[in-house]
Regions:
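Short hydrophobic alpha-helices and adjacent helix-cap/hinge residues
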Residues: 2-195
Length: 195
C-alpha cells in the first residue's frame, strides 16, 4: 500500500511540479530524483476512455517532465498525424524510449474507444483482474474521467494517477479536495475550474 502511494506521488509530482521546479533553485523542496523500486524498474500502464486531444498532450507533457528530471532519457517524442492517438505514443514509450528507472509496459495499454457498452466494461474487468492478481504493474496512468472511475476503487492496490478528468469529485473518482478516499489514488482536483 505504501509503495503504491509513493509511486503515485512520485509520478504526480514529476508531471505536475517538474516544469515549475526546473526553472527554480528550490528543487530541494520538491525532490523528484529518479530511483528504482526495490532494485527494479517501476512498471507503468495506461488507460483512457477513448482518443482525445488532451489525453495525448497530457501524456506528452508527462513524458517531457520525466525526461527533464532524469527518469527517462531525453529523446525526440514522435509526432503523430492524429493528435488524439495515444496508442502510437505508448508503443514508442514501451519499445523505443530509454530509462534506467521506468518501464512502460507494452501490453498494459487500454482504450475503450468511447464504447461504453462493450469495450469499457471488458477493459475494466481485464484491468482490475490484472491489477489485483498480475503483480506486474506498479502504477497506472488513468487519463480522463472514465479511466479514473474505472480504476479508483478498493479492488486493487496499484497506484493510480488520474489526469485530465473533468471533475473528479462529482464523477466519484475522489471523495473530496483533500482526500481521494483511497491510499493508492491521486487525482488533480481544482474546485474552482468551472466557476
Amino acid at each position: 500500500m505504501r509503495k503504491a502511494a509513493q509511486a503515485a506521488t512520485c509520478l504526480l509530482l514529476v508531471s505536475l511540479l517538474a516544469p515549475l521546479c526546473s526553472f527554480s533553485e528550490d528543487r530541494r523542496f520538491y525532490p523528484v530524483t529518479p530511483r528504482l523500486n526495490d532494485g527494479q524498474k517501476w512498471r507503468i500502464g495506461y488507460c483512457e476512455g477513448g482518443p482525445y486531444l488532451d489525453y495525448r498532450q497530457n501524456l506528452v507533457e508527462t513524458v517531457r517532465a520525466l525526461m527533464a528530471t532524469g527518469w527517462v532519457e531525453t529523446a525526440d517524442i514522435p509526432r503523430s498525424d492524429d493528435d488524439s492517438d495515444t496508442r502510437r505514443l505508448w508503443d514508442w514509450l514501451a519499445e523505443d524510449s530509454r530509462s534506467r528507472f521506468l518501464r512502460f509496459v507494452a501490453d498494459a495499454y487500454w482504450s475503450s474507444d468511447w464504447d461504453e457498452q462493450t469495450a469499457r466494461p471488458h477493459n475494466k474487468s481485464v484491468m482490475l483482474k490484472r491489477l489485483k492478481t498480475g503483480n506486474d504493474l506498479d502504477l497506472m496512468i488513468a487519463m480522463g474521467t472514465w479511466a479514473g472511475q474505472d480504476l479508483a476503487n478498493s479492488y486493487h492496490q496499484v497506484a493510480v494517477v488520474v489526469a485530465a478528468a473533468t471533475n473528479p469529485i462529482q464523477a466519484g473518482i475522489v471523495k473530496s479536495v483533500d482526500d481521494s478516499g483511497y491510499d493508492h489514488v491521486l487525482a488533480k482536483v481544482d474546485p474552482a475550474r468551472y466557476l
